Design a protein with these regions (language model features):
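Glycoside hydrolase catalytic-domain context in secreted enzymes
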Residues: 1-700, 712-719, 723
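Short solvent-exposed strand-capping/beta-turn motif centered on an Asx-Ser/Thr pair
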Residues: 645-651, 788-790, 801-803, 854
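Short coil-to-beta strand junction motifs in C2/discoidin
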Residues: 652-656, 709-711, 803-810
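Beta-strand-rich interaction surfaces with strong enrichment in secreted/lumenal proteins
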Residues: 676-682, 706, 772-775, 824-827, ...
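Short strand-edge motifs at loop-to-beta-strand transitions and within beta-strands
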Residues: 678, 686-692, 781-785, 833-837
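Short beta-strand elements
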Residues: 726-738
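Disordered, acidic Ser/Thr/Pro-rich linker "stalks" and the adjacent N-terminal cap
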Residues: 737-793, 799-805, 829, 833, ...
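Trp- and acidic/polar-enriched beta-sheet ligand-binding modules for extracellular glycan
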Residues: 803-867
Length: 868
């Protein structure tokens, strides 16, 4: 029930020794974390870790450790080797992907699935059976240090990509995917870490709508086998000791069947930081009773095992509870095959496949698809390699590798920097002038974010060198942003501006009058207002992985057309925070329209770049939206179709985004909710039709009784290139199923099989054989006819008496359960005589006529399969 941190973390030995048999923890180890992965011994290679590489030697060493637990312990239960893996498995060398924020900006489910598969496959080949990914935190505060680890701000997008990552990782149960950090972890007060990440700022409804949503879906749809409990409290109750969150919700409501591992030292934090337990023993008691299976810590496992034994002996923790906790762990170990195949046998395959060329191609694709073009004034990009004889490159991230080798992924792979990528791309004989220009941060940082210090002579000299290079070049590429110095765990910021002297460098280079392209390599959105106004071209690369330099150079010179879209919001200033997507109506604007001395505007409004935004070297046109059915019940999906055409001269990718809004609701809902997306590739002139399905869950709200419901009414559908660039829109209507009033006044038994949404007293008139009487209906209203058993209708005869000019209708069939499928759409023709409408027949229990536009009246209906 404990984790033992591996070599040079807590464990002192690389391979088993005779001393291991004397250790208290030998019979209680659930997992060994990060063993021999090289995290504590960065270097080329680490001198004191002979088992870090090659891959086969590493796998052999983990086999030997596993052999000890199987052959030398009382029960012979294999251990679960765990490791990090949000941008590739954290080994000395493995396939290196962009960080998770970059992967989010691909909007590519299939690609993320491949990343997950490679991460899990390489993890298992190296000997690991449990990988800590994906991250299901939802980005809400751009200052937060771990923003680089989220997929984005939309809970729907986090869920969709999290599902694919987890499914890929757990292919054939090659590893267990352990998601983190459960729950309400990513909205700390002020964006601060606070070590225990205490006091998240959100309402209960927001927790459910934003933060619980991805977990619920990923657990149900991907079946993740691991969950890491988070440090933080919510509403004063630490998640680590919460039976409500770890058992009632996680296991009871969501159906989680794996095991829960604590974040490192989270158990200790109950008494050392939260103050909700008196000591370690009480912390252990609270955690185990709440639902914790395995405790993770940077200390010896004895500190947990000893108080746990005391609590069991005292009867404070029943053996039935221990059995439950151990059963979960064993279930996961059985599922990943540890009892059948505990050793990695094919060591030659390990060397052949880990970080192989095929996997690196997937990583390069991910690096390319994560790029977002933020600005391209006058089509500065792409650069023409044939017209450039001199190019200047500067900036602290131009020749930097560290952003590709941060924690939670591969540690020592070869990295292609932006400078190297450019040098590899330009034609022979092209002069590439490089100078760094400035450091990532200055000597007074982070205080320099509050107080402006004058440039030192040395700083001015470095900027002057960059200016001289720019003056003699055709174009200058400035590579700025952040690194693990400014972003990462415990690296929250008080500003979103470019740190250090980076803006000074950029302004000086732009002042030369030569063309400038800004490349951003960073782990969070930045407030680059000056750059947006004065720099002609800006490309956001996030942390693009070890092949980021190649991907960026391909985009700069037109061998690749960037097509990523923002999954986050770029505020104009830190003073706007919280500023994110989705948002409630008018929640992110202030009053006042007139600027200046005589105006009434007191605050800057709007984002610098909104959620979903991103440019391309080509253009796209949207057309032909259709919604089917236009009238649905609360349990019925809606199909939305549209067409997108590449109207430019280059092939390119477009991320088509589907949003929905509940127009009238019992509680305030979000202005737009992302409910669908698709990344498509189009050649010049090519058109593709896209099909989206809006599921009932996408329309749900948490009502005043804290029940998830789909409320009847109109919903607005929006299809666009971003959350603020809506190209197409339409509506559909949800009607309440089961509330129709059955007709009881009819004179025939047949008429009792008819129900309607309105004008119940007139319903019998459609079956009375009299064309002078009619049932009248407006848009959204319908009449439903029950059919005889095993009916398979393919036609219905309708006599329309009156109609408005815009009257349209649908014929729908249902197999039961309230879901109806549209089989015919048409325009009402008021001839007052029966007209036969034919459609493709299928087995159905009910047939429905729905008025989808305007109003109309029906005088008679004939259905040969009508139930008697």
């Amino acid at each position: 029930m404990v984790t033992l941190y591996g070599y040079k973390r807590v464990l002192k030995d690389d391979l088993p020794t005779s001393d291991w048999k004397k250790q208290l923890w030998k019979d209680g180890i659930g997992a060994i974390d990060e063993h021999l992965n090289g995290f504590q011994q960065w270097g080329l290679p680490p001198s004191d870790n002979p088992y870090v590489w090659p891959a086969s030697r590493h796998a052999w060493a983990l086999n030997e450790v596993q052999r000890f637990f199987i052959e030398e312990t009382r029960l012979g239960i294999p251990t679960d080797f765990t490791n990090e893996g949000i941008r590739g498995v954290e080994s000395y060398i493995a396939t290196n992907f962009p960080t998770q924020l970059g992967l989010g900006h691909t909007w590519n489910r299939n690609l993320v699935h491949k990343v997950g598969y490679i991460t899990g496959r390489e993890g298992r080949l190296l000997g690991y059976t449990n990988v800590y990914a994906p991250i299901l935190d939802v980005g809400r505060d751009q200052r937060w240090g771990r923003y680089e680890e989220v997929y984005g701000e939309s809970p729907y997008l986090v869920a969709e990509l999290g599902i694919e990552m987890a499914k890929g990782m757990q292919t054939d149960h090659q590893v267990a995917a352990t998601s983190k950090h459960y729950i309400a972890y990513s909205n700390n007060k002020g964006g601060r870490e606070g070590m225990a990440r205490v006091d998240p700022q959100m309402s209960p409804r927001e927790v459910e709508m934003i933060h619980v949503y991805p977990w619920k879906r990923v657990i149900k749809e991907a079946g993740i086998l691991g969950v890491m409990s988070s440090y933080n409290d919510y509403d004063g109750f630490p998640i680590q000791s919460s039976y409500y969150w770890l058992t009632t919700r996680l296991r009871g409501e969501f159906g989680f069947r794996g095991y829960v591992v604590s974040d490192s030292d989270a158990v200790e934090y109950l008494f050392s930081k939260h103050g909700t337990a008196a000591d370690m023993k009480e912390s252990v008691l609270q955690s185990v009773l709440a639902g914790l299976n395995i405790r993770c810590t940077f200390r010896s496992p004895d500190s947990y095992v000893l108080p746990l034994r005391e609590l069991i002996a005292e009867g404070a923790i029943p053996m039935s509870t221990i059995d439950d906790r151990v059963r979960d762990i064993l279930r996961v170990k059985f599922l990943v095959g540890l009892f059948d195949h505990p050793y990695q046998i094919d060591l030659k395959e390990t060397d052949k496949e880990v970080n192989c060329a095929e996997n690196q191609q997937v990583a390069l694709q991910a690096s390319k698809e994560s790029l977002v073009l933020l600005k391209n004034q006058d089509a500065v990009l792409p650069l023409d390699v044939n017209k450039i004889s001199k190019i200047a490159v500067c900036g602290p991230n131009a020749d930097e590798e560290a952003y590709a080798l941060t924690h939670y992924g591969p540690l020592a792979v070869e990295v292609t920097t932006v400078l190297e990528g450019i040098r590899n791309k330009v034609k022979p004989g092209t002069n590439v002038f490089f100078t760094k220009g400035c450091d990532l941060v200055d000597a007074n940082w982070p205080e320099s974010e509050l107080i402006r210090y004058p440039l030192t002579a040395e700083e001015q000299s470095e900027i002057d060198k960059a200016v001289e290079n720019a003056k003699k070049s055709d174009v200058t590429v400035v590579v700025l942003g952040g690194s693990n110095r400014t972003c990462g765990e415990n690296k929250s910021r008080s500003s979103l501006d470019l740190p250090g002297r980076q803006l000074d460098l950029l302004q000086a280079v732009v002042a030369t009058g030569k063309p400038v392209v800004l490349i951003l390599i960073n782990g969070r959105p930045l407030s680059i207002n000056w750059a947006d106004k004065y720099v002609p071209a800006i490309l956001e690369a996030w942390y693009p992985g070890s092949q980021g330099g190649t991907a960026i150079a391909d985009a700069l010179f037109g061998d690749y057309n960037p097509g990523g879209k923002l999954t986050v919001t770029f505020p104009k200033t830190v003073g706007q925070i919280p500023f994110n997507f989705p948002t409630k109506p008018n929640a992110q604007v202030d009053g006042g329209r007139n600027k200046g001395l005589d105006g009434n505007m007191s605050r800057v409004n709007g984002p610098l770049y909104p959620f979903g935004y991103g440019l391309s070297y080509t253009t796209f046109e949207y057309s032909d939206i259709s919604i089917q059915p236009a009238i649905v019940t609360q349990v019925q999906p809606v199909t939305v179709r549209c067409k997108v055409t590449n109207t430019g001269k280059r092939a390119g990718d477009e991320v088509v985004q589907l949003y929905v809004r509940d127009i009238l609701s019992s509680v305030t809902t979000y202005e737009k909710n992302l409910v669908g997306f698709d990344r498509i590739h189009l050649n010049p002139g090519e058109t593709k039709e896209l099909t989206f399905t809006i599921e009932p869950r996408d329309l749900q709200l948490l009502n005043s009784d804290n029940h998830w419901v789909v409320e009847p009414g109109d919903f607005k559908v929006m299809v666009g290139a971003s959350s603020e660039d809506i190209r197409l829109n339409d509506r559909f209507t949800v009607v309440e199923y089961g509330k129709e009033q059955a007709v009881t006044s009819a004179t025939s038994q047949q008429q009792k099989s008819v129900i309607a949404s309105s004008s119940q007293e007139s319903v019998p008139l459609v079956l009375d054989g009299n064309l002078s009487t009619a049932w009248k209906a407006n848009k959204g209203e319908y009449i439903t006819f029950a059919l005889e058993n095993n009916a398979s209708p393919n036609s219905i005869a309708i006599a329309w008496k009156e109609k408005s000019k815009d009257a349209k209708f649908e014929i729908q069939l249902s197999g039961g359960g309230g879901q109806f499928l549209t089989v015919y759409e048409g325009t009402v023709e008021a001839t007052n005589e029966l007209k036969n409408y034919r459609f493709k027949g299928t087995t159905a229990s009910d047939i429905r006529i729905v008025i989808t536009s305007g109003n109309a009246s029906i005088s008679e209906v004939k259905i040969k399969e009508l139930k008697n």
